[in-house]
Amino acid sequence: MLLTELSQILFAQIATPAVATDNLEFSFWKIMFHGGAFAKIVMVTVLLLGIFSLYLFFERFFFIKRLSSKTDSNFMNNIEDFIKAGKIEAASDYCKTQNSPEGRILEKGISRLGRPVSDIVSAMEAQAQVEVANMEKNLNLLAVVPSIAPMLGLLGTVIGMIIAFFNLSHATGSFSPKTLSEGIYTALGQTAVGLAVAIPANFCYNILLTRIDKFVLKAQNMSGEFLDLINKPL
């Protein structure tokens, strides 16, 4: 019954002469908040998720960037000079003054000089894990946004479609295709907004992961250089 009525409406619309639409202006902002109370709640929630994801991204991005810029460019060369000169305490103090992830990792290794190499490696790996965890703080919250935002948008779309077809099934007298189309494009707008929030959030999340991966690679190379240094004949 419903499909028959929809077909009649569609054929009637095709048979009707086209109406001039030159004065119509597409406004996605109006579409976003065109629906009922539930649609507005979904839209506001998704937009808040978008703002939240941007805050997390910039906070983590500049935090990681600030940490990466603290280490001296000649850090490893200076450490090598201290070690070769036998100034272990000075090397440890130099690492502390850096106040950087690299400095803290090497300081753990220097503080265990004289012990088995496995102890030195374990100490540096443990500190590296602490530094990575510090960089990844709240990153799991950002990872959730690309999953939740489209689902909320899809929920809004499904509810909107249900409402649109419910109104169609209970319509009396002649029914305008405009009424149905408004319900459909309003509902689809929910999914569009969800995707518009999820895609940049996913992109931002992967940018942060890439920067953290670069730090991990840098820390591994630095640890390897340090182990080569302490095992090198003086």
Q: Which functions belong to the PLM regions below?
A:
Residues 36, 54, 91, 106, ...:
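Residue-level signature of catalytic and energy-coupling elements of molecular machines
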Residues 25-27, 43, 140-143, 184:
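Short hydrophobic "helix-edge" motifs at membrane interfaces and signal-peptide entry regions
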Residues 172-187:
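Hydrophobic alpha-helical transmembrane segments and adjacent short intramembrane/lumenal linkers
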Residues 62, 67-175, 201-234:
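Predominantly long cytosolic amphipathic alpha-helical stalk/bundle segments
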Residues 184-203:
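Hydrophobic alpha-helical transmembrane segments of polytopic membrane proteins
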Residues 2, 7-75:
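Hydrophobic membrane-targeting segments
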Residues 39-56, 146-150, 156, 197-201:
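Alpha-helical transmembrane segments of integral membrane proteins
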